[in-house]
Every structure is written in structure tokens, then in C-alpha cells.
UniProtKB/Swiss-Prot annotation:
NCBIfam families: rpsL_bact. GO terms for molecular function: rRNA binding; structural constituent of ribosome; tRNA binding. Residues 102-123 are annotated as: Disordered. InterPro entries: NA-bd_OB-fold, Ribosomal_uS12, Ribosomal_uS12_bac. Disulfide bonds: none annotated. It comes from Lawsonia intracellularis (strain PHE/MN1-00). This is Small ribosomal subunit protein uS12. Pfam families: Ribosom_S12_S23. Belongs to the universal ribosomal protein uS12 family.
């Protein structure tokens, strides 16, 4: 515990909060172009082939974004919209691609949580 004199000589340091989605620069979403679409494997207890894409954003930054849902139509030069939100078992993946916008199609035959995957209401 510092004395009053110590506080007068050196003021307390502010704790700097780290942004969880720095590439969005305070925006809710950002547009970008896929530079590479590939699969990667998750961290230790899990096993799968997770679909991810490298995306060059309109602000010039390049990030890795997760492609949610079953099946996708993305390839190189696809224009996508990304949002914040990390994938817990993929290190370095801090963003999600939004399904059903721009060049990204919605998930086919999706019946529950459709709005999260850009799927239309089934007839």
C-alpha cells in the first residue's frame, strides 16, 4: 500500500484494456475479400476439420475468420462480411463470417436457429 507522498510523486498507472476484436476498429461488422479458404484442426481434446478463411478487410488488415454451419460456397476472391466472436478451440481465430450476406450463401436445410445461419423459412 503506497503512502500519500509516494502517490504524489508517482501517480497510479492506468490498466490498459486490450480489445478483443482490434481489426473491426470499433465497427460492428467489416467487409473483406477472401484470400485463402482452407480447413484447420482444433486444439487438444477436440478433433475435426474446421473451415476457416483468411480475409483482407477494407481497412487493409488481414484476419482469419471462421465459416459457421454445414457446407459453404466460399472461395478465393469471395466478398464476405465479418463480425467479432472467437472460436475457442482454434487459436488465432477471433472473427466469424456472417452467413447469408454478400457472396456467402445461407446454410441449406437449416430448420432451427435459422437467423444465425442466413437460412430462409422452410415451406
Amino acid at each position: 500500500m503506497p503512502t500519500i507522498n509516494q502517490l504524489i510523486r508517482h501517480e497510479r498507472k492506468k490498466v490498459v484494456k486490450r480489445k478483443k476484436t482490434p481489426a473491426l476498429q470499433g465497427c460492428p461488422q467489416r467487409r473483406g475479400v477472401c484470400t485463402r479458404v482452407y480447413t484447420t484442426t482444433p486444439k487438444k481434446p477436440n478433433s475435426a476439420l474446421r473451415k476457416v478463411a483468411r480475409v483482407r478487410l477494407t481497412n487493409g488488415l488481414e484476419v482469419t475468420a471462421y465459416i459457421p454451419g454445414e457446407g459453404h460456397n466460399l472461395q478465393e476472391h469471395s466478398v464476405v462480411l465479418i463480425r467479432g466472436g472467437r472460436v475457442k478451440d482454434l487459436p488465432g481465430v477471433r472473427y466469424h463470417i456472417i452467413r447469408g450476406t454478400l457472396d456467402t450463401s445461407g446454410v441449406q436445410d437449416r430448420r432451427q436457429r435459422r437467423s444465425k445461419y442466413g437460412a430462409k423459412r422452410p415451406k
